[in-house]
């Protein structure tokens, strides 16, 4: 009998760096800019993607240098993950952290990102490049029902 996959055996804190990185499905949702109301701290979701995001592949074009190139790039870590209530319910970090399994379309289960793109989980069908946007308020999305 084969061993269950690592995400069913370990907590996020117990995962190796490579296991942690492999959980990311590459949907690009983390790379969409959010606006925060300074008075209420409410988060507004936009379809404005960081210029480092390759919208077609939903991959960072400069992953190794992303933090030096984009000062607002957010690094999800085991330590700060609990502060990111805005992560979508499809996010593997959120799912595993809440004790759930990976969705059937996740690349670790399917071997590719095709199913994820087919389910329209990725941002490639809605994202626009940050450098092409004049007024970000024109790009605010309806607040997802799962967003806190």
UniProtKB/Swiss-Prot annotation:
Pfam families: CxxCxxCC
Name of the protein described by the UniProt record: UPF0260 protein YPO2083/y2228/YP_1926
Signal peptide positions on this chain: none
NCBIfam families per the UniProt record, alphabetical: PRK05170.1-1, PRK05170.1-5, PRK05170.2-5
Organism of this sequence: Yersinia pestis
HAMAP family: UPF0260
UniProt superkingdom: Bacteria
Transmembrane segment boundaries: none
Annotated family: Belongs to the UPF0260 family.
């Amino acid at each position: 009998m084969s061993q269950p996959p690592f995400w069913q055996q370990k907590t996020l804190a117990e995962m190796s760096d490579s296991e942690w990185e492999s959980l990311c499905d590459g949907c690009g949702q983390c790379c969409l800019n959010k606006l925060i109301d300074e008075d209420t701290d409410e988060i507004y979701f936009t379809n404005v993607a960081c210029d480092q995001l390759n919208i077609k592949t939903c991959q960072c074009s400069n992953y190794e240098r992303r933090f030096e190139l984009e000062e607002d790039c957010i690094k999800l870590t085991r330590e700060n993950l609990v502060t990111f209530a805005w992560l979508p319910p499809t996010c593997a970090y959120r799912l595993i952290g809440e004790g759930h399994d990976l969705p059937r379309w996740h690349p670790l289960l399917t071997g590719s990102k095709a199913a994820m793109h087919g389910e329209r989980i990725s941002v490639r069908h809605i994202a626009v490049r940050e450098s092409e946007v004049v007024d970000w308020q024109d790009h605010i999305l309806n607040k997802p029902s799962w967003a806190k």
